[in-house]
Amino acid sequence: VGPNGAGKSTLLKLLLGFLRPKAGKIFLFGKEISQFNEWEKIGYVPQRFSVEKFWTGTVEELLRKVAKKEKVGWIIAFLHLENLLKRQFVKLSGGEQQKVLLALALTKNPSLLILDEPMTGLDIHAQEHIEHVLKEISKDRTVVVVSHDLRFVMRNASRMLCLGMPECRVVYPKDFGQIIRELYGLH
């Protein structure tokens, strides 16, 4: 978490190997990121994604193209995508697209799942459902979430990395409230 401009997106780009650190090293699964070649262990759901440039088919076609057939069924049921399967991805709402992008990331059964603003574009019912899904999938994998939704973070995070303070800090649940007040100047 952190205010705009604190470096949240930059941190994600570093974790995903899109940027190289100017100083220090980043390790993923015990390997320095420049030597890391097991990207299938990482699932990523961007905040915004323009799939229409290369995909005009249905949600079902997209899922089957990306995933092995046996993996798709549980994901469709788990995310309640049944009513979206025959629809074109480009004609879905932003929230519906977000759910499909999460499904695509889960087809890899990643050890690390990185989500950039996963609640963007979701109505309250969809937010509650995605929050439940994230609780379930985080039981057997590491989930990194960038979010401006502080209530979501405080309800779900086991640790919070606070950017935009005098120094970057890892915070545990008992201190969340105090750090949020400091970070956003609330008293």
In which residue ranges do the predicted regions lie?
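Conserved ABC transporter NBD signature motif
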Residues: 24-38
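Hydrophobic anchor residue at the start of the ABC signature
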Residues: 102-103
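Catalytic Walker B motif of ABC-type/P-loop ATPase nucleotide-binding domains
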Residues: 113-117
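Conserved ABC ATPase signature
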Residues: 88-92
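Conserved beta-strand-loop-alpha-helix hinge in the C-terminal portion
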Residues: 163-187
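Conserved ABC ATPase "signature" region
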Residues: 70-86
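Helix-to-loop junction immediately C-terminal to a conserved catalytic motif
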Residues: 16
